């Protein structure tokens, strides 16, 4: 009996270590406008309510501390995303995982590519390398430093690129 109780205790203690890593699934990527949009920013935040609330607070105050919470998904465009995976994943990239996505009119999303420095954006640049170069001191979130205009995007172009096939018409 003591053995069973001991094994149960070990299993219970192991769960928090596993829970510190978030692995995004296609269902985690929804209509862009369903995400929370911080005041004065163009990106949208997704995740569990508690995560979104923390991420919004960090974004709105600009006090990132140790960075965004694990489980945060940030999207500027419906076809790209970054998710704070955490754990031991991508230490050199701040724990972020980058995605190329295909949003579908039926509301679903396909993950075309996921990873670290090997994932490229619509300009064929490494997402991670660009984010690290531009905003390493801001948990790799470029809008704190340069914003979309820093990579040559006008407000009109950003709005056009934010058109999302998953959103109800």
Task: Go through each PLM region and give its residues.
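Sequence context surrounding c-type heme c attachment/ligation sites in exported
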Residues: 20-42, 65-169
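N-terminal post-signal-peptidase region of extra-cytosolic proteins
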Residues: 48-65
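Sec/Tat signal peptide C-region and signal peptidase I cleavage site
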Residues: 15-19
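Positively charged n-region of N-terminal signal peptides that target proteins for export
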Residues: 1-4
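Bacterial N-terminal signal peptides
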Residues: 6-14
């Amino acid at each position: 009996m003591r053995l069973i109780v001991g094994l149960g205790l070990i299993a219970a203690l192991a769960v928090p270590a596993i829970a510190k890593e978030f692995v995004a699934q296609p269902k985690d990527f929804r209509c862009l406008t369903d995400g929370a949009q911080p005041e004065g920013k163009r990106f949208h935040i997704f995740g569990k309510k508690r995560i979104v609330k923390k991420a919004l607070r960090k974004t709105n105050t600009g006090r990132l501390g140790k960075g965004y919470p694990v489980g945060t998904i940030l999207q500027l465009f419906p076809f790209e995303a970054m998710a704070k995976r955490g754990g031991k994943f991508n230490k050199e990239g701040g724990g972020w995982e980058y995605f190329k996505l295909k949003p579908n009119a039926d509301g679903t999303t396909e993950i075309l590519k996921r990873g670290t420095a090997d994932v490229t954006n619509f300009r064929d640049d490494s997402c991670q390398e660009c984010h690290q170069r531009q905003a390493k001191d801001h948990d790799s979130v470029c809008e704190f430093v340069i914003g979309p205009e820093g990579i040559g995007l006008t407000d009109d172009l950003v709005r056009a690129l934010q058109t999302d096939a998953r959103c109800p018409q």
